[in-house]
A protein has these predicted regions:
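Short, conserved charged micro-motifs
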Residues: 14-18
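Short amphipathic alpha-helical segment that frequently serves as the phosphate-/nucleotide-binding helix
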Residues: 19-23
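Structural beta->alpha junctions
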Residues: 9-13, 64-66
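Active-site-flanking beta-strand signature of metal-NTP-handling nucleotidyl enzymes
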Residues: 3-8
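A general secondary-structure junction signal
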Residues: 42-44
Length: 96
């Protein structure tokens, strides 16, 4: 099983627009072979001392059955199209 945490730093004031665009691909991604989980998460205030809030960060949590399934997902033409569309909304992103 492969777990992926993608951290997306969204341009100020663009988080809701980013989430609308992102949620548009979720059903298609979840239908892909090997996709176990795929969802976005945003920070909210919990009051816990170690928490660092960043209202412009979206964390995308993914779980795939295999590395091959993840590579096939990342290589999908519709994902390339999606990344091109969200480019205007994103400052930077990284995965772990």
């Amino acid at each position: 099983m492969i777990n992926v945490l993608a951290t997306v730093h969204v341009k100020k004031g663009k988080v809701q627009e980013f989430l609308r665009l992102f949620k548009g691909i979720v059903p298609r991604v979840r239908a892909e072979k090997g996709c176990i989980e795929y969802f976005p998460a945003i920070d909210f205030k919990t009051g816990l001392p170690p928490q660092e809030l960043d209202e412009n960060v979206v964390t995308i949590m993914e779980r795939w059955e295999s590395l091959e399934d993840l590579i096939n997902h990342i290589s999908s033409p519709y994902i390339a199209e999606h990344l091109e569309k969200e480019k205007e909304l994103v400052e930077k992103s990284s995965i772990k």
